[in-house]
Amino acid sequence: LVLLAVGIGTNLFYYMTYEAAMPHAFNFSLISIFVYFTLQFYQNPSYGKIGFMGLLAGLITLIRPTNILVLLFFLLWNVFSLSSFKSRITWFLHQYKLILIMAIAFILVWIPQFSYWYWVSGEIFYFTYGEAGGKFFFLNPQIKNILISYKKGWFVYTPIMFVAFIGILSLPKIKEGLFAPILIFIILNIYVLSSWWCWWFGGSFGLRAFIDCYAIMAIPLGAILHFAHSNRWLKYTLPTMIILLIGFNNFQIQQYKNSAIHYWWMNKEAYWETFLKLRPTARYWEVITIPDYDKARDGIYVDMKPE
């Protein structure tokens, strides 16, 4: 059920099919492999595994630099207390060759990109977005907007991820060492993404920037389903709800394709005007608003009527 929920019950499905050229499904796959090898590495550490993980981390970060946060997931895996964290740091200091190999492999992936940037611009580091004012506002994170707003809230347009988020609370009951790496990664990921000037990430179905981390979010989703299995009431209601949310996600995809969900962002009136409707109504076009990009580049977020 977890595989179905993540695979066809989220906006990952849309970006694997209708807009497969976007990088999110690729990064989802890379992070899935990275998570798998994190588990394998700590069961049986080796130079080969850490080198491959360095290559993976380099490619993941090259595709989307903010995904460097997956290294925190790797560092904190199976850490459940301050003493276990100290032990992890001490272990890596003693096994410094592992970190060195990972760092070299990480940088190797970036060398072709550095070379290309230097060739075309004369600079090793080059900002390729080319958008005036493209920056982070770390003192003005749009956490409420990015999570629960009608505009493009992650939990509004991908509600299965809200179930997964709640599932983080059940992780300590499943296994020690799961809670800290996932909670810290998710909180920092939300903070960083919500601090980007264009926190809604342009025209898209749902919050596409979160797709990359769905392999990590699958863990608490599985945990809450496992926890629910021991409860007479939740044993049936939670899986049923997830199946309904899978259907709802696919209905919303059709809404998005038919413009009943706007690609820029929505508002409360527009959302409820087309709720459970496959196509937009005449009133929908009257109440829809879009973001003011010029003001957003200054960290000011207001609606404006489309011309």
Where are these regions (language model features)?
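Membrane-proximal envelope and lipid/glycan-remodeling enzymes
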Residues: L1-E307
